[in-house]
Amino acid sequence: MTNTIVISCLHNMAAILYCGQIQKLVVANAHYQVSDIYLGCVDKIFSGINAAFINLGKNEYSGFIHISDTGPLKKKYYVNNITNILTIRQKILVQIIKEPTLNKGPRLTANITLSGRYIVLMPFSQSICISRKIYDEDERHYLKSLAILIKPATMGLLFRPSAVGVDEEIILSELKNLKEQWNFVQKSAINSYSPVLLYKDEDIVKKVIRDFYNNNTNNIVIDSNLGLKQLNYYIHTWHCNNSSTVPKIKLYSNNQCILDAFGINQAISRALIPKVDLILGGYMFIETLEAFTIIDVNSGSFNNSTSARETVLKTNCSAATEIAYQLQIRNITGVIIIDFIDMESQRDQLQLLEHFNKELSLDDAKPQIVQLSELGLVELTRRRQGKSLYELISSDSNYFYFFTQSERSQSLKRFDDRQQKQQIFNKSWLSAEINTINKVFFQKSNLCRPANFYLIRNLYIVKSSITYKQNYLLTHRSKLIYSKEYSKVLPSSYYLASLNKNSNQEFLS
């Protein structure tokens, strides 16, 4: 299967394309990312649930750690009360294993690990682990023997699937780098005051090549000269160019935004719409709630089969294929309940589940079908791997940058023309909105620039960065503009009037 990696250093995100279709989005630089290492401070302890909240020094949420994740801190294995392990204001070295959701903070562990392309260093473990994705028994025996020889005495090693067939010198070189990283973390922890961030994997190029590059990668496109140098460095360091197929690396230099050129913005836009049309004519609705996600499948106008039974089966199989794709592109995790079109035949139900299992097997997040309930609902779970697309856009103003630099993102133009015409743009109506926008979008200097805003579900979205040559810009929705002179968002009527006379001084005051 052909594989193309598109990296946008400007937007700090990347996309993995299979046969021209976007399968996965990769984003870096979140407030809390998996594998970030903090020197935290114990804030609260709840002995009833054997858990504690750790102050990480920023944002609104504290991290959550359970007693089962405090292994290195236990002086004795049989300790079963967290109050015997942690005390208030105690310093603790922790790592994020689950990113925060809209209402919960990040999940933490004291079992620190450092990941490379081929191996994972486990400083607080002495075990040797081989990835389950390595099926060759001879290769597993070889890697285990190699680990016994090279493993540090007080640390453990885990071999990733990419370690198959790799020369020992390359693995030794990576082990050396990981040990140096761990030494750096330890020294930083000793010399720092908690709470503080000690280690963060912010390099989008490194993250993509380490976690997603494989022998099927044929093309890599990147939009930055500096990023291109980093890309060549990591490919050379990890000896990715020694594989049977050497990928073609291209620097993207067209005027069109790279996210538009490869359809990434369009894919994100479509993934924000609850309704998804099926190829055969049916459709489905995807609604994500706090507890679970609901998917409802409908046949719509599809009626190209000889019988109603065949129509239902084809529609359900088409929906199963699309659901497997939508779970990946939207990064929907947790409990998922699917209401397929009712089928009376158990043979058809079995055929649908077999087809659905086959489609889900291509997903790295390992979705598992739990059961087909008596009501005909398919229940499955999907392992959490970072934030969902909806969470990225809803929870963090930095992720409004998802849509920056794109002046033709079609989904952000879905407005109700009738309501727009009826909207009254006066000083009293706009005052609260303007204050909110200024507070949300211009609290950080890197966002203080002329910008477009769009209203989606009562949420303002930044559409694009505009050239610094323009002093103001009318928006399509609210008729608001950003004034460089006053560093505020103002109603267009007030600002345009100020070009001829100072009629907006009363409003600014």
Swiss-Prot record:
Transmembrane segments: none
Cofactor note: Binds 1 Mg(2+) ion per subunit.
Keyword RNA-binding found: yes
Record: residues binding Mg(2+): 296, 339
GO molecular function: endonuclease activity; metal ion binding; RNA binding; RNA nuclease activity
Subcellular localization, as worded in the UniProt entry: Plastid, Chloroplast stroma
Classification via CDD domains: S1_RNase_E
Domain spans labelled S1 motif: 35-117
Predominant localisation class: plastid
Keyword Chloroplast: yes
Source domain of life: Eukaryota
EC number, UniProt record: 3.1.26.-
Keyword vocabulary terms for this entry: Chloroplast, Endonuclease, Hydrolase, Magnesium, Metal-binding, mRNA processing, Nuclease, Plastid, RNA-binding
Database matches in SUPFAM superfamilies: Nucleic acid-binding proteins
Family per record: Belongs to the RNase E/G family.
Record-given protein name: Ribonuclease E/G-like protein
Protein species of origin: Pyropia yezoensis
